[in-house]
Amino acid sequence: GAYIACPDPIDFRAFTVVDDFSRECPTIHVDTSIGGLRVVRLLEELRATRGFPRTVVCDNGPEFTSRAFLTWAEERGIEIRFIQPGKPTQNAFIESFNGRLREECLETHWFTSLRHAREVIEAWRVDYNEVRPHSSIGDRTPAEFAAQFRSEAA
């Protein structure tokens, strides 16, 4: 996950989650503030459709070093792998994803409200998952790749 600060007429943050295997982005949560408890709630919501991850790779932001997040992960046996400060390449998938999000969506829109930001960012996320093929997964969309993997694993 990552936490992107987005100055505009409104100040908001975007919490992003990317599956390193499928390249899918199951959620981008947009709000004025996103703390450790909110991150835990978001990951619990994802559990219903995706299960829990074995590992979470994240930076050392306060939402990831919070007691709520660390306790949640420990109770579920989830490994937390913190990247070293100043070494974003240790979390290359999310850094690449966040760069695309910033360049293709955040820097090309002037958001007038939190609702507007959420709508535009969600449309971008759907396009990223369902329309855009990725060379790293055989020129399939992340949604196609994940669906194929699930059917082969069944």
Residue ranges and their predicted role:
Residues 1-154:
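Charged DNA-binding/catalytic regions of mobile-element recombinases
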